[in-house]
Amino acid sequence: MKFSSLSVIGLGYIGLPTAAVFASRKIKVIGVDVNQKAVDTINQGKIHIVEPDLDIVVHAAVTEGFLKATTVAEAADAFIVAVPTPFKGDNHEPDLSYIQAACQAISPVLAKGNLVILESTSPVGATEQMAQWLADARPDLTFPQTHDEQSDIRIAHCPERVLPGHVMRELIENDRVIGGITARCSDYAVALYKTFVQGECVITNARTAEMAKLTENSFRDVNIAFANELSMICDKLDINVWELIKLANRHPRVNILQPGPGVGGHCIAVDPWFIVSKTPEQARLIRTAREVNDSKPEWVINKVKIAIADFMQANPDKTTKDVSVACYGLAFKPDIDDLRESPALSIAQQIMTLHNGAVLLVEPNVQSLPAKLSSAELVEFETAFAQADIHVLLVDHKAFKAAKPSHGIIVDSKGIW
């Protein structure tokens, strides 16, 4: 099984690195995205996201002619769908419309012998749904859900499991779970990924592969929820949670995670709801963990309100408009520029709403603020240290660990100050 060309649908934080790594192995890669600006940037050999070493690989792949980007799908031997799977509205129901749109984009150029892989983190059954959408669009081709191993098109699910900031290494080194709709589909998918994957490609079926990714992130979410709930308990009991966790973790079989302002990102804050949406009666612990982590930003905001009140009491000559609040960090985790599902971003936004004084935002990994924060000021952390009265640490970026505000009231959600 040899693949000389590949199309990657979706050139975001997962799609672009995946496309670039395949292209670095001298496979002709066509990247497809609806964002014309991203397409133009990539075709110049540049990148529109922040990921260490990605720029070097993309530049080389484009320069050598192995990677190009376009807004219209083209024929290829294999297709990887790496598009978002957000929620529908506020009810935590998975929205598969991006996957459906990807199917509509590639169906006209599908040909007998093609492999289609869904990489997007998805609820159980999404790969089968994708296969059905493709079958409906191309009745002239056969698909594995009806023709088993004899199908014209092979379909599989292979969830990504990489850490932002380490994507280029982990894409290559990490094990991959590969779930074909049939065994032959799995074999074709393994052959494709073995182009660059040095980790083990573990074969299962599509539904189990989908559930594996959701399980990994739900497990992490539950453990984070324990730490976050513990931090709120300790606050009530006047106990230093950071010291407590250090002591408890001296037990050889205890490994409590570090609490924070909530849980963010496009995986841990989202994936557990995909399980809950399918099995609401059974997923009680998973739902509760999500609710605990989703409640933590409000707890942090209450701490900020108390800090402002304490400052006002200590400075009776000032009004709230005179009080300056600095928020340190907007990304969903340290040392990246990804603001998706970020509790820090949500907290900063709510502080801007409730506080009528100056709000300074410090995020060393972005050059500009999203539109919903445009009324705030993006500043260097030295400026915030000097000007702010209330210092709210939300993300433990390396830059923030090296220094600490010398005056004002500190609200530290990460325990580094």
Put a short name on every predicted segment.
Residues 1-417:
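Structural/interface elements that position substrates and couple domains in central-metabolism enzymes
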